[in-house]
Amino acid sequence: MSLILDDIILSLTNANERTPPQALKTTLSLLYEKSKQYGLSSPQLQALVRLLCETSIIDTVTKVYIVENCFLPDGYLTKELLLEIINHLGTPTVFSRYRIQTPPVLQSALCKWLVHVYFLFPVHSEREHNISSSIWLHLWQFSFLQKWITPLVIWQATTPVDVKPWKLSIIKRCAMHPGYRDAPGSATLILQRFQCLVGASSQITESIITINCNRKTLKSHRNLKLDAHFLSILKRILSRAHPANFPADTVQNTIDMYLSEIHQLGADSIYPLRLQSLPEYVPSDSTVSLWDVTSLEQLAQNWPQLHIPNDVDYMMKPSLNSNVLLPRKVMSRDSLKHLYSSIILIKNSRDESSSPYEWCIWQLKRCFAHQIETPQEVIPIIISVSSMDNKLSSRIIQTFCNLKYLKLDELTLKKVCGGILPLWKPELISGTREFFVKFMASIFMWSTRDGHDNNCTFSETCFYVLQMITNWVLDDKLIALGLTLLHDMQSLLTLDKIFNNATSNRFSTMAFISSLDILTQLSKQTKSDYAIQYLIVGPDIMNKVFSSDDPLLLSAACRYLVATKNKLMQYPSTNKFVRMQNQYIMDLTNYLYRNKVLSSKSLFGVSPDFFKQILENLYIPTADFKNAKFFTITGIPALSYICIIILRRLETAENTKIKFTSGIINEETFNNFFRVHHDEIGQHGWIKGVNNIHDLRVKILMHLSNTANPYRDIAAFLFTYLKSLSKYSVQNS
């Protein structure tokens, strides 16, 4: 439909004095209809602004009607559109005396429209922001623009840096001009905004007192109202054009947030404005503004009377450089700024409708909608606030942990999950497992869709969920829920699309190791009375782990099997979980050391016939190479290279002149090495105590068992469950 509106705007642009009135009327009727139906893009609006401000074939009343009823954006607006409007505001100067003068009533209508759609414009860079805020203040000096430029000036002022002495001078001079009817009220509101940003300032206070705007006028200016009919049409167009970015409730709440910045101006003043200059005046409530507190001692002394300013947006921002207008007595308040979020939550009694809560929710929504230039500064603040209140964390999780926000911004969602989930506990057990299973399943489907098989989002989020479960299992009320959800996470982590990419995606390995470590710690507890079904992992999962080529994962599995030993001894051998665990131990000892894979009934649930057929079809360098040599710690994928490295370290430690050069350690290569170097070994020796392959494997295991070795639990497993190796256990040494 953009093409239809392009044609309509082009037709209007090409119209001139010779265009038949009926043709122009028909084109305008189409503009009225189609703009309300589909909305206008930023380039289309820019073309219309230029047309309305420069054409003479459309009367002023019609131009104003078009701005008020047809300027309905279908998405975000550009700074080019903003510059187009600015270029047509004001009156001709000595430098632009021949510029076409835009009618003042049309200029006012354009500024009014900007106020209604301000939330759709991008966040400026710091330099652009400084220039833009200066331009708006200069335009504010035109009396016919003051009413609608005042909100723009207020919204543009967001940091103490925006408060400049020259701005105060301009505002005060205009406010005192007798011909400017709206200036006193507008100027006072802007000054109150500045005061919110810089705190107590004698220069700002004196200006407000000098202007002396009466309460009734100030209240009427502060009570800004927008066109509800226009906004209802705008919300419908935005939500239909971009449902993910512009849900109707999000748009309305964003607008309300901007309006509240104006409605609440002055509400945090310590003294009524007219009595500000009277030194003998004592306020009835004896409140002390948080802005005036500069030390912990002051904070403690004034706690009952402490008043929280309404400018949450500034209070939650990272510390900024002090402004030149700040008096020395409050220059150090930034040192307390890290406490502001805590103070706000405590003073608001954790009221979910309070402004800090709403600020956190809407700032996060703006982050997901890419409306914030520096989300890396905002998100840590929100995480810090939510970490102190579980209810706020619950609201954030319920609102943002879903596929909708994942699609909007994966990185932001990962930051939110990483910061909030590990410390969060559910208030209600019912529905929590289902919520997270649905959430993680949706992330899995999204992460493994076509072309995204190596996406880390799923496994990284799993890791954060498991950190959360680690916290849950310390709570007796949540342990059953936590362990049930843990097994759900393990099932997802061992799905082929994730597990097969574990080597390139370490988050999946970290997540699964975390899940096993949780079960390991619970199994070690002497007073553990958790049902055994929560502690034993099913064969579909464990068999994949055992056959993994990841030594860290294999070591974690061995650590888990050793930890569950004492727990399982409390149950009869006929118990299905005991039999399941015994099968794990039998398979893993055969695989790692006993070398009875091909003679056993099965290995990890797979028939030995399968392995025989594979091994018989492998290319072997020597004809007498036996199939059995492919197994044990020195031959399996997870440990073969590690064993080579350990052997080289053993040779270096004993300063051997002869080096084992084969890339494979097994009985055949070892015997061949001894046969070739028999005389040299007899003369110079090799590794002390190593005379056969069994001795070498024991030496390697002893080296593995070192407490500093990340794979030490593999050795501990074999020392625990193999009688022939039990004498090498650390406990028996």
From Swiss-Prot:
Keywords from the UniProt entry: Acetylation, Cell cycle, Cell division, Centromere, Chromosome, Kinetochore, Meiosis, Mitosis, Nucleus
Superkingdom, natural source: Eukaryota
Positions carrying N-acetylserine: S2
Disulfide linkage: none
Other information: Present with 319 molecules/cell in log phase SD medium.
Function: Component of the central kinetochore, which mediates the attachment of the centromere to the mitotic spindle by forming essential interactions between the microtubule-associated outer kinetochore proteins and the centromere-associated inner kinetochore proteins. Required for establishing bipolar spindle-microtubule attachments and proper chromosome segregation. Component of the kinetochore, a multiprotein complex that assembles on centromeric DNA and attaches chromosomes to spindle microtubules, mediating chromosome segregation and sister chromatid segregation during meiosis and mitosis. Component of the inner kinetochore constitutive centromere-associated network (CCAN), which serves as a structural platform for outer kinetochore assembly.
Subunit structure: Component of the heterotrimeric kinetochore subcomplex CTF3, which consists of CTF3, MCM16 and MCM22. The CTF3 subcomplex is part of a larger constitutive centromere-associated network (CCAN) (also known as central kinetochore CTF19 complex in yeast), which is composed of at least AME1, CHL4, CNN1, CTF3, CTF19, IML3, MCM16, MCM21, MCM22, MHF1, MHF2, MIF2, NKP1, NKP2, OKP1 and WIP1. Interacts with CTF19. Interacts with CHL4.
Annotated protein name in UniProt: Inner kinetochore subunit CTF3
